[in-house]
Amino acid sequence: MRFLLSAVFALLLVLSMPMRAMASDTVRGGQIFNTNCAACHAAGGNIVKSERTLRQADLEAFLPNYLTGHETGIVAQVTYGRNAMPAFLDVLSENEIADVAAYVEDQASHGWS
């Protein structure tokens, strides 16, 4: 009986966790992107370096680690920045950065249409 109660309690605890802890949120990522990233990356472009867009082919060509883990590569770029891109480590939370990465990956895989 004690085991059953413990199992039920554990299940309730897991089910009550916010979905954000379980998966990235592309809708929220889009909102965060529009607030923090779209000034330079509107519609997946890049106003600073036009050849380094957020389109799939450019991410594959220019973003370290993108081919081995799409969102992981995006998370690293957003978190630590590189070249002209600023770091967002002190601006966005880990969950917010993960949401932005999920949004960018989703948009890139659909051609930013």
What do the PLM-derived regions correspond to, one by one?
Residues 26, 30, 42-75:
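Gly/Gly-Pro-rich "capping" loops immediately C-terminal to redox-active cysteine motifs
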Residues 8, 61, 66, 92-95, ...:
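A broad, structure-centric signal for solvent-exposed, well-ordered loop/edge residues
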Residues 27-38, 48, 69, 91-94, ...:
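Sequence context surrounding c-type heme c attachment/ligation sites in exported
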Residues 48-57, 75-107, 112:
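Axial heme c-ligation environment in periplasmic c-type cytochrome domains
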